[in-house]
């Protein structure tokens, strides 16, 4: 009886935490998308929530911004509090109200996204720019690297004196290639991706 109650309680807590994470993720993604739509003046198309197949399952990318000045692969983090970490650390730390929370290094997370996008094309590496954008009231307490920024730095970081790389025809090809390879946006695709993540976690567990 006790084990049944514990199981039910665990499921309820897990569901609630999952909903909270998804809600926070959606807020961050909306803020990034709205900022780009309002202030980024270069010719571009923004692809959101891009799920692509990989050799080991799937990867899900918050944003792929295809612009005439490059292909930006963007990971969004809607966090507040103090953020500690570094490019080479496997985990970073959020400190909020004296509570410490560990989370995966988003640079490493986004590197996998970047390599998946790069694999679709035969373009120079410098055409692809990874960015991690924090959209909450976070304060960086250590050097997180040049490609980790706050939302209010996004537009300046996107432009940053970059030369034009693609004409309209090339941009259309890049967008079409990603759209052709991505899985259809749906709840089923999201659940499929989550199941792949759970499977990888189980495989790593002793």
Residue ranges and their predicted role:
Residues 1-59, 66-71, 80-82, 91, ...:
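Surface-exposed interaction regions that form or flank ligand-binding interfaces
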Residues 85:
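Acidic/histidine-enriched active-site and ligand-binding environments that engage anionic O-linkages
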């Amino acid at each position: 009886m006790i084990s049944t109650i514990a199981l039910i309680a665990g499921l309820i807590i897990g569901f609630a935490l999952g909903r909270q994470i998804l809600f926070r993720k959606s807020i961050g993604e909306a803020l990034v998308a709205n900022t780009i739509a309002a202030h980024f003046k270069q010719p571009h198309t923004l692809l959101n929530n891009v799920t692509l197949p990989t050799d080991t399952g799937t990867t899900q990318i918050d944003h792929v911004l295809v612009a005439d000045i490059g292909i930006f692969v963007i990971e969004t983090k809607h966090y507040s509090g103090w953020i500690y970490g570094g490019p080479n650390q496997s985990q970073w730390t959020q400190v909020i109200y004296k509570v410490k929370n560990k989370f995966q290094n988003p640079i490493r997370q986004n590197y996998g996204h970047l390599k998946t996008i790069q694999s679709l094309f035969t373009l120079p590496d410098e055409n692809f720019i990874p960015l991690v954008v924090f959209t909450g009231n976070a304060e960086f307490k250590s050097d997180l690297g040049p490609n980790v920024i706050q939302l209010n730095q996004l537009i300046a970081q996107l432009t940053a004196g970059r030369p034009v790389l693609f004409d309209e025809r090339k941009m259309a090809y890049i967008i079409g290639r990603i759209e052709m390879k991505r899985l259809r946006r749906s709840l089923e695709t999201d659940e499929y991706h989550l199941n792949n993540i759970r499977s990888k976690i189980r495989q790593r567990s002793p």
